[in-house]
């Protein structure tokens, strides 16, 4: 009975952990029915234990260190590098501390749906967006991430977005975010003048 009670208490604690955001050092950049996009900085402070309730992906845009504390209290110092991308499944539970004089920074996308929707526009009158001039840097069951260095300009050819997409453009390490619904036809990603851009195609 004591064991069962202890398990129930643990499950209750896990279910009642706060989400990772909002918190000090974060700014919400965009939210709609599909995603929440955050600009995240790891300040030199200890953050509460939290649980990632959504699958999430993103890109770091500065170098930086942080200390990750596991559920069991194990501490590990990690270094992240600017322009590395990532994808993690929901359920990650930990706490974090910024460990750099210049904070690690990144743009995080949280996917609200528990699984990919699989919505794809099949219209063929306009060529589909295929990351032309970009590089496919990561793909998972939830997202395809394209990197453009430099960012696409307004001289690009017209194309159709077959999937919903989040465009993140960086100018002097300042992110700008926009959402492009599937079926959109245009000639550019509104990233002219940016140093680089990332297109996150949502599956």
Spans of features found by a protein language model:
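Jelly-roll (double-stranded beta-helix
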Residues: 3, 13-203
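Sec-dependent signal peptide recognition
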Residues: 1-7
């Amino acid at each position: 009975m004591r064991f069962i009670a202890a398990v129930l208490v643990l499950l209750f604690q896990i279910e009642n952990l706060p989400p990772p955001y909002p918190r000090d050092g974060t700014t919400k950049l965009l939210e709609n029915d599909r995603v929440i996009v955050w600009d995240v900085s790891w300040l030199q402070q200890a953050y509460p234990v939290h649980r990632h309730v959504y699958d999430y992906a993103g890109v770091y845009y500065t170098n930086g260190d942080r200390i990750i504390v596991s559920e069991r209290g194990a501490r590990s110092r990690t270094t992240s590098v600017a322009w590395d991308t990532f994808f993690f499944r929901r359920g990650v539970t930990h706490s974090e501390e910024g460990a750099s004089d210049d904070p690690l920074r990144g743009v995080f996308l949280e996917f609200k749906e528990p699984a990919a929707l699989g919505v794809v526009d099949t219209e063929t009158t306009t060529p589909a967006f295929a990351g032309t001039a970009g590089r496919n840097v990561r793909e998972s069951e939830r997202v395809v991430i394209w990197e453009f260095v430099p960012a696409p300009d307004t001289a690009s050819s017209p194309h159709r977005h077959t999937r919903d997409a989040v465009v993140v453009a960086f100018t002097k390490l300042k992110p700008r975010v926009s959402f492009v619904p599937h079926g959109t036809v245009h000639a550019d990603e509104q990233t002219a003048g940016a140093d680089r851009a990332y297109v996150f195609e949502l599956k």
